[in-house]
């Protein structure tokens, strides 16, 4: 087998005819500026060709079920293995996918519970075990030999009637004593039972003291009792009838209520199968309901003024119902909703129950008619309309009032009652899936089951333990197996897939990874790199697109692509060992690694103003432990902490949702908190995350940033366009008029090829230009609208520098390092980091008031050291304008330049959720329990770290505020 992957003439996207040789079975890191062509080489060339060749080796029938990659633009490639790509893209948007199901650990857990689980009665908690007569006798012989006992057979359980026939049958069979409702009687003197009351009748089969010499007698007595009691029997002391009886069953059922289960099988524990799913929520764990908080959109207004949309004066039909209600219950329809009595509000929302109300209806002729009936209620009315309508538009409108809540039937466990009551070592399956992965691993390490159960469990437990161990190795010990897949970050999803691949144990495969260190704290980096080297040591080629310094330093072979981004990139600046990269004169990466170039620490940090702070008190969502957060206004604040410590819950789920609802008038669900103070300092809140800017190829940077509108208006002002009467709409590829109708403005036509990949061919009418010939005849400075969309941001800025409305938006795209993007580049081709920076540029182009609260979640994703330097300049510029910038970040270069750092921890999951320290980076670096501080100290001058706890009189306060320790 060849020892090299040979690539010749790679021209995918912006790659400039690259020729290179990569060593196989090594850890290769591809680095370079954002947009320089790293992903084009790793994913769109090497992975695409490896995958394509493997799939093409399959039969034509099999190929039609697989997505075949497009053939990359290159001359030759040799030495490829079958390729597996592990990307950042979110794992699944399916609400049924969880960490357990993705990793297949849940499948092993289902098998474990089906084979060795101990079912119990949900009501009486007795194990469902079919006992033999010998087992029953052996159990009785362990009882106190000094006590007297009686053996009972239940004949009637909790049934109404006098039961005279039962007593006659028992008498005829030779029984002399019975126990009725807990009282012992001779069978001839049983009192007459009350006809309409429930009674329990048990026949006394035997009375004894437990001794070895009565073993045979006991066995015969038990056989009689089981026959009479339909497989049930009980033993009770004769001296004190208040003690709990010993219950026995020869059937697989509860000895008290006869509850039974069919044989356990893995399907019973699957929330995706009808056999195991909770019937109330169909295995989703949540139910939808019309939320009164969303129905009453303006509680400060009156019903007549629009407290409930659609039920005010403007809607005559529904308002006449409210008017009749007001008359019946004597409340004022002009009083605010908040001031109405609770019972009145409940009646309006949920109906009048059985109470009949006189309603006055207006007829079409203008008259009035009276009718008496119950009031349905606003919420039941919405539910009925949602259920009965066949209109998608009506459903979409009504869905605005719907919220989700934990299923009241299963408590969010997704499983039905039977599956929730099967135990392994006194734990149910839902109890295991809510444990953090490191605790679950500990449970399985110490799990010892007796007898045959232990023998069966040993192999299953080994598989579960290994897979849990892999998740811990990639830094995901804080996750739980029941965590929904659609709540995972890109980095978490990628590392889960990485753990699954290690579990597969394949050899001779080529793995291509996209920034696996995203969202990972420096502390966990070592474990991740250990995982990558383990994959390599198995005999695989591991190709990683990465910017993390530790990963670059640990690579066997480094490839630096550049020198710039977009059209300025696509070349190999340097390749080889770490030393070769550091010595290469053209390598920007080498300059940062060698220390010749670095991101500087600010000479002076902006001090916080104690009188201008945003105070959030008692935040306790997910794993937060009543956190009290203080954010200084007008500063650049970093939120740090190990993965799973609660950063996203505190900032995204609590602070942002709260501020957006209060300031922007949004209606996000807010994680629980006690109080908030200081929101009046801000007039706008902006959250810039990494979700895509558009999910269709028609969305692009020009449309998203709002630049396309002034661009179309500019073309409509060209003399030729005015002469023809063209409006700005003529230059849109989304509406009829100016677009090419053959391809409906796509520029491409999809040709389905079945077992080959779908081919997109340029439209043969417009030749891929999206517009019709007449529209393309309109030119501005010699360029038509298609030429402009094909331009890079950099080139477009030169063309439109005299048009402020367009130039301002282009300048901000350049500021955030996106000068290489084409204006019309499809949004679906942008990486998460690029999408986030497009959003940032959109916000930057708006006129800010200096009172905006910006929240960014890991903005350095996908960024090279050089890009980070440019991003920091933008963030500091926002701060200098008086705005408040909050960044959730692991990157130490960003943290060291912050004015204020708030570090959460100390660990992830249940062992996190507290603020360890809040202060300057120097203060955090000096904190003994902060993992962030430990790594940060290495980047800060030693004197700062040692002196951070001391200050001269009058010096600004920058010492750490230590909380919860």
From Swiss-Prot:
InterPro entries: ABC_transporter-like_ATP-bd, ABC_transporter-like_CS, ATP_grasp_subdomain_1, P-loop_NTPase, UvrA, UvrA_DNA-bd, UvrA_inter. Keywords: ATP-binding, Cytoplasm, DNA damage, DNA excision, DNA repair, DNA-binding, Excision nuclease, Metal-binding, Nucleotide-binding, Repeat, SOS response, Zinc, Zinc-finger. It comes from the Bacteria. It is found in: Cytoplasm. GO terms for molecular function: ATP binding; ATP hydrolysis activity; DNA binding; excinuclease ABC activity; zinc ion binding. SUPFAM superfamilies: P-loop containing nucleoside triphosphate hydrolases. A zinc finger (C4-type) spans 254-281, 740-766. ATP binds at residues 32-39, 641-648. One of its GO terms (cellular component) is excinuclease repair complex. CDD domains: ABC_UvrA_I (cd03270), ABC_UvrA_II (cd03271). Disulfide bonds: none annotated. One of its GO terms (biological process) is SOS response. Pfam families: UvrA_DNA-bind, UvrA_inter. Residues 311-588, 608-937 form the ABC transporter domain. The UvrABC repair system catalyzes the recognition and processing of DNA lesions. UvrA is an ATPase and a DNA-binding protein. A damage recognition complex composed of 2 UvrA and 2 UvrB subunits scans DNA for abnormalities. When the presence of a lesion has been verified by UvrB, the UvrA molecules dissociate. Forms a heterotetramer with UvrB during the search for lesions. Belongs to the ABC transporter superfamily. UvrA family. PANTHER family: UVRABC SYSTEM PROTEIN A (PTHR43152:SF3). This is UvrABC system protein A.
């Amino acid at each position: 087998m060849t020892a090299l992957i040979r690539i010749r003439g790679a021209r995918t996207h912006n790659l400039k005819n690259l020729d290179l040789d990569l060593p196989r079975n090594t850890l290769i890191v591809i680095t370079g500026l954002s947009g320089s062509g790293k992903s084009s080489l790793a994913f769109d060339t090497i992975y695409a060709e490896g995958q394509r060749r493997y799939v093409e080796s399959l039969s034509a029938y099999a190929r039609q079920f697989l997505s075949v990659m497009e053939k990359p633009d290159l001359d030759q490639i040799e030495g490829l293995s079958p390729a597996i790509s592990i990307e950042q893209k979110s794992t699944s948007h399916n609400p049924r996918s969880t960490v357990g199901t993705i990793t297949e650990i849940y499948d092993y857990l289902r098998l474990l519970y089906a084979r060795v689980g101990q079912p119990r009665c949900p009501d009486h908690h007795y194990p469902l075990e079919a006992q033999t007569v010998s087992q029953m006798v052996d159990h009785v012989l362990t009882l106190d030999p000094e006590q007297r006992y009686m053996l009972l057979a239940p004949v009637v359980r909790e049934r109404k009637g006098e039961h005279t026939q039962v007593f006659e049958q028992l008498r005829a069979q030779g029984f002399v004593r019975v126990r009725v409702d807990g009282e012992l009687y001779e069978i001839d003197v049983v009192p007459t039972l009350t006809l309409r009351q429930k009674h329990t009748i048990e026949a006394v089969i035997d009375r004894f003291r437990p001794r070895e010499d009565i073993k045979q007698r006991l066995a015969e007595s038990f056989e009689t009792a089981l026959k009479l009691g339909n497989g049930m029997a009980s033993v009770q002391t004769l001296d004190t009838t208040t003690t709990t009886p010993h219950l026995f069953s020869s059937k697989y059922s509860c000895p008290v209520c006869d509850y039974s289960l069919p044989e356990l099988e893995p399907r019973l524990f699957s929330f995706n199968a009808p056999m195991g799913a909770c019937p109330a929520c169909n295995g989703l764990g949540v139910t939808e309901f019309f939320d009164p908080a969303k129905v009453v959109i303006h509680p400060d207004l009156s019903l007549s003024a629009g407290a409930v949309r659609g039920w005010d004066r403007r809607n005559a039909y529904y308002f006449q119902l409210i008017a009749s209600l007001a008359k019946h219950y004597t409340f004022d329809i002009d009083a605010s909703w908040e001031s109405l009595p609770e019972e009145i509000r409940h009646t309006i929302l949920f109906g009048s129950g059985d109470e009949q109300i006189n309603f006055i209806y207006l007829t079409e002729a203008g008259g009035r008619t009276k009718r008496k009936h119950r009031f349905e209620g606003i919420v039941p009315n919405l539910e009925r309309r949602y259920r009965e309508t066949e209109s998608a538009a009506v459903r979409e409108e009504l869905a605005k009032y719907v919220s989700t809540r934990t299923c009241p039937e299963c408590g969010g466990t997704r499983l039905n009652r039977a599956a929730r009551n099967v135990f392994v070592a006194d734990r149910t399956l839902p109890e295991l899936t809510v444990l953090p992965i490191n605790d679950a691993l500990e449970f399985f390490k110490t799990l010892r089951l007796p007898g045959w159960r232990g023998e069966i469990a040993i192999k299953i437990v080994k598989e579960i333990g290994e897979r849990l161990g892999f998740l811990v190795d990639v830094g995901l010990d804080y996750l739980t197996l029941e965590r929904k897949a659609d709540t995972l970050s890109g980095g978490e999803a990628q590392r889960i897939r990485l753990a699954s691949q290690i579990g597969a144990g394949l050899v001779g495969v080529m793995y291509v990874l996209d920034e696996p260190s995203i969202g990972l704290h420096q502390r966990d980096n070592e474990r991740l790199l250990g995982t990558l080297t383990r994959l390599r040591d198995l005999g695989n080629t591991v190709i990683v697109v990465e910017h993390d310094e530790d990963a670059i330093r640990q690579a066997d072979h480094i490839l630096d692509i550049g020198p710039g981004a977009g059209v300025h990139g696509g070349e190999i600046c340097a390749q080889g060992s770490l030393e070769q990269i550091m010595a290469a004169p053209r390598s920007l990466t080498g300059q940062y690694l060698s220390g010749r170039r670095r991101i500087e620490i600010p000479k002076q940090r902006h001090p916080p103003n104690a009188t201008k702070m945003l105070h959030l008190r008692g935040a306790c969502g997910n794993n937060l432990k009543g956190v009290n957060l203080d954010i200084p206004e007008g500063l650049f604040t970093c939120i740090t902490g190990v993965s799973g410590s609660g950063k996203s819950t505190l900032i995204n789920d609590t602070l942002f949702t709260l501020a957006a609802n209060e300031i922007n008038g949004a209606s996000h669900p807010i994680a629980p908190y006690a109080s908030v103070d200081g929101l009046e300092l801000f007039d706008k809140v902006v959250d810039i995350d990494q979700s895509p800017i558009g999910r269709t190829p028609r969305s692009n940077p020009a449309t998203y940033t709002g630049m396309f509108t002034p661009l179309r208006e500019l073309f409509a002002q060209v003399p030729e366009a005015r002469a023809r009467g063209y409006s700005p709409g003529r230059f849109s590829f989304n509406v009829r008029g100016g677009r090419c109708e053959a391809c409906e403005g796509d520029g491409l036509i999809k040709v389905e090829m079945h077992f080959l990949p779908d081919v997109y061919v340029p439209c043969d009418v417009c030749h891929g230009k999206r517009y019709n010939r007449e529209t393309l005849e309109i030119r501005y400075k010699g360029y038509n609208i298609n030429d402009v969309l094909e331009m890079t941001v950099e080139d477009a800025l030169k063309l439109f520098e005299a048009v402020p409305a367009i130039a301002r938006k282009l300048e901000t795209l350049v500021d955030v390092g996106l000068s290489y993007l084409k204006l019309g580049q499809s949004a679906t081709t942008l990486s998460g980091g690029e999408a986030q920076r497009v959003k940032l540029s959109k916000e930057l182009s708006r006129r800010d008031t200096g009172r905006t609260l910006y929240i960014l979640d890991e903005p350095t994703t996908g960024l090279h050291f050089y890009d980070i330097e440019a991003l920091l300049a933008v963030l500091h510029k926002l701060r200098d304008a008086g705005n408040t910038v909050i960044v959730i970040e692991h990157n130490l270069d960003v943290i060291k330049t912050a004015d204020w750092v708030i570090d959460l921890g100390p660990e992830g999951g249940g062992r996190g959720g507290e603020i360890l320290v809040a202060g300057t980076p120097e203060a955090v670096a000096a904190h003994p329990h902060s993992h962030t501080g430990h790594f940060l100290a290495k980047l800060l001058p030693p004197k700062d770290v040692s002196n951070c706890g001391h200050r001269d009189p009058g010096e600004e306060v920058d010492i750490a505020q230590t909380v919860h320790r």
